[in-house]
Amino acid sequence: MIGVVDYGLGNLFSLENALRFLGADFRRVSRPEDLSCFDKLILPGVGAFPRAVAALRETGMFEALKRAEQPLFGICLGFQLLFTSGEEFSLTEGLDLIPGRVVRLEGPVKIPHIGWNSLHLCRPEHPLLEGVREGDFVYYVHSYRAVTAPEFELAVSDYGQTVCGLAGKGRVSGSQFHPEKSGDVGLTLLKNFLEKRF
């Protein structure tokens, strides 16, 4: 059973449609005490880093996610929350499950970064990337990017700067792009998360 973390800031409709298409057994989870009922967790999110952290703290989900032992996959803002800190509006502590910080995209490119971009696979052997090819396109919507060590970067995109598109450390991974909006490539990645062992 997959738990989709619902803390009031995720647009869950597209993600749930993708999970349904893949035949996944899932339900939303909003109480920290229920996390242990699930085999794997997905942390979506749309909006601002500080507001998301505040929402997770208010429900007790922040500390619960830090303690959780299941595989966890973050998407977009949920991906950014996996890192040590975020610099949106003010410096805010993240979940610190993957070392790194979240910083604003730099010009002269258009911000936010909206649209399709190609992937360079840093670790093509990683289970999440099985069936994903060098140069495959995925769909981004974001104004901030994660800066992390190369050892945690699974795939990156070029947008006038390196954008960490996919990162992972142990049981924790996530994507800055939206796999649920990235066609067959995104579905492949989600399927890998559902089926592979981490």
PLM segments and residue spans:
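Short acidic low-complexity segments
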Residues: 1, 26-37
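Short, surface-exposed beta-strand/loop micro-motifs that present aromatic residues
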Residues: 161-169
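Pocket-forming structural segment of enzyme catalytic cores
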Residues: 84-161
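Short amphipathic alpha-helical segments
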Residues: 16-17, 53-56, 84-87, 152-153, ...
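N-terminal beta1-alpha1 ligand-phosphate binding loop
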Residues: 2-24, 177-181
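Acyltransferase
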Residues: 175-198
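Short acidic/histidine-rich motifs immediately flanking catalytic phosphotransfer sites
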Residues: 35-45
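Cysteine-nucleophile active-site neighborhood
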Residues: 47-115
